[in-house]
């Protein structure tokens, strides 16, 4: 007990010396977090031994000490990585390297030079909100290289430049949906109006829009531009759908009644056309079933039909065991199909229950023929697959695109089952890279390959959308299942499943 108290007092003295010296060096900040880590570990150990007080200091629960120790370890690793870069010689204070500053937007980034940004909604000074823009943001790229990027503000939000991309860490439209009634706002930086509210459509510089040159960096100039993000479209929809508006049309007006009657007439005509099409389909299916029953007694003239049996491959493959040399359906004006066969087997393919012959239209269809052709050898493998199905061991083994010619619907479904499976993981870039490196050491053999970290880019701009992504490919679905059961994904990482035609 006394030994723990003495060690705890030594750590307290070290922290006091760091606070009093206030050295703005990165070495001093690393020492500060190392001391905090030792303090959290000591308090954790004391709590495990049943000690509730060390002198006048109350010993927190185990979960609190564990969380503080992990936080100190994380900050210490980040600072040690920053120490190896060219920015280690810059002054770093306790505020710059605090956990609160590191976790503030943009999260998990070191930043300096806070600037106050005030956004006034609906041109009402009492309806305002304050944000923080950082002059410089430090981030790590995919190659573990540190970069220093300036931050800026425009009518869309606050961003920092990540290479050639604008990474928005504050979007004014998110709070405008809660605080604004008209969808307009005014942006003020250091009590200077940067963007005044005007009536316009979607701003071209918003994420997914076109780039705009009227943006403000760390020393913004006074300009005027559109300040609504998706404001006009939302406002129009609200005015048309909301009842009792001041300038809205009354529900009992003549135009509203005429539009309602037109809508009712359209819905009635649609329902009548649907009922007529259903009755036609029923009559056609009955006539086809009668012709099919009459043709069962004729063993020489057998057309080859294609059935659909609710997705069960076994029922479909049993109906493809016959070998018809040439079966052709000619389309007549009456909508009936006549078939002519040169040779056929004595065994008749059985029709599965619940199947439908041909398509839903009244025209005849050409069935798949197995007559000899120059591509018979290349189709030999697909024909055998359609006859016997796919074994579980072959699922996910194909690495080539599926051909759409001479395979039919069933053959394409069976060939697509051979596509290699993948897992798409989403998270922070550093987290995904650490997960990839850990998987190479611990889970080798449970996957085929990892991709690099990548991101989606807006169609009309250069902004990155969402979090970073990474693909994991496998040889089979069983391997992916084993990987999913064995591997423990990092916290904050989401995953989804899929497959590709080729890799």
Curated annotation (Swiss-Prot):
HAMAP family: PPV_E2. Binds DNA as homodimer. Interacts with protein E1; this interaction greatly increases E1 DNA-binding activity. Interacts with protein L1; this interaction enhances E2-dependent replication and transcription activation. Interacts with protein L2; this interaction inhibits E2 transcriptional activity but not DNA replication function E2. Interacts with protein E7; this interaction inhibits E7 oncogenic activity. Interacts with host TAF1; this interaction modulates E2-dependent transcriptional regulation. Interacts with host BRD4; this interaction mediates E2 transcriptional activation function. Residues 1-201 are annotated as: Transactivation domain. The keyword NAD does not apply. It is found in: Host nucleus. Its main location: host cell. This is Regulatory protein E2. GO terms for biological process: DNA replication; DNA-templated transcription; regulation of DNA replication; viral DNA genome replication. Plays a role in the initiation of viral DNA replication. A dimer of E2 interacts with a dimer of E1 in order to improve specificity of E1 DNA binding activity. Once the complex recognizes and binds DNA at specific sites, the E2 dimer is removed from DNA. E2 also regulates viral transcription through binding to the E2RE response element (5'-ACCNNNNNNGGT-3') present in multiple copies in the regulatory regions of the viral genome. Activates or represses transcription depending on E2RE's position with regards to proximal promoter elements including the TATA-box. Coiled coil: none annotated. Belongs to the papillomaviridae E2 protein family. Residues 196-404 are annotated as: Disordered. It comes from Human papillomavirus 21. The keyword Nucleus does not apply. Keywords: Activator, DNA replication, DNA-binding, Early protein, Host nucleus, Phosphoprotein, Repressor, Transcription, Transcription regulation. It comes from the Viruses. Residues 213-234, 317-346 have a biased composition (Low complexity). Residues 419-503 are annotated as: DNA-binding domain.
